[in-house]
Each structure stands twice: as structure tokens, then as C-alpha cells.
């Protein structure tokens, strides 16, 4: 198992969606502030500065060139369109990593699988958040 490259802030929930058949991982961060998370990722060397993430940004994807992972950052209250939009970026990054062409059916299955993982992780995060408040 590879070491986790991300150190989450105290107000972040970090999960991972592994794709072992592609030697690829999608890290998922749910946060109270996407802007603070962006700054944290800059300090960890995972995001370039300036990063263009501000208080109007709802969610974003950190694309890691020549790396076997991508990072999705979502607010606690992410909606399905934001969830799917960023997950699509992650799947496209994974396809580039494995050298696959944009094959519609395969991409659709993997996107659906990843969105289900993110949605399930969001529900689990919401339950944890409920217990702490």
C-alpha cells in the first residue's frame, strides 16, 4: 500500500477511491473551506500557487501530472452536479495515466463507480459531522 501523500486539516475528511487495476488512486477531501484546503495543499507541495481557488470556488480537482493519483476537493454540502463534474476530471486524469483513449462506455462505468464512492463517502462524512456537533 502506498503512503498517503495528503495531510488533512482538522476540519477535513479524507478518503480514497483505489483503482488497483490501473495503479491509480483518487483522494477525496470534504472540507469546511475549499480555499483553506487549497492553501494547505500548496503548503504540502501538491498544488501550485497562485491556485485561482477563492471563496467563490465550490469544488476543484488537483491534477497530478506524472503521478498515479488525483485529488478531489468538495465542500461539506457538495451537490450532485459538482460531485459529478469533479469526478469526471479525475477519470480523465486516470485515462491519461494509463494511456487510454476516451472510450465512452468504459469512461461512463468508471465515472458512475467513482461518483457512487464519493456519494457514499459524503454520507459517511455527514454522519461523522453530525456526531461532532
Regions found by a protein language model. Give the residues of each.
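Short, solvent-exposed coil/turn linker segments
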Residues: 30-33, 83
Amino acid at each position: 500500500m502506498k503512503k498517503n501523500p495528503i495531510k488533512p486539516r482538522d476540519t477535513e475528511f479524507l478518503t480514497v477511491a483505489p483503482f488497483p487495476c490501473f495503479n491509480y488512486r483518487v483522494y477525496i477531501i470534504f472540507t469546511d473551506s475549499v480555499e483553506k484546503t487549497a492553501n494547505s495543499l500548496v503548503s504540502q507541495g501538491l498544488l501550485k500557487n497562485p491556485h485561482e481557488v477563492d471563496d467563490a470556488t465550490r469544488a476543484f480537482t488537483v491534477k497530478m501530472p506524472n503521478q498515479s493519483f488525483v485529488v478531489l476537493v468538495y465542500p461539506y454540502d457538495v451537490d450532485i452536479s459538482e460531485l459529478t463534474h469533479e469526478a469526471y476530471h479525475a477519470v480523465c486524469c486516470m485515462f491519461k495515466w494509463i494511456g487510454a483513449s476516451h472510450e465512452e462506455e468504459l469512461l461512463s462505468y468508471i465515472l458512475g463507480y467513482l461518483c457512487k464512492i464519493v456519494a457514499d463517502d459524503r454520507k459517511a462524512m455527514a454522519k461523522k459531522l453530525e456526531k461532532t456537533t
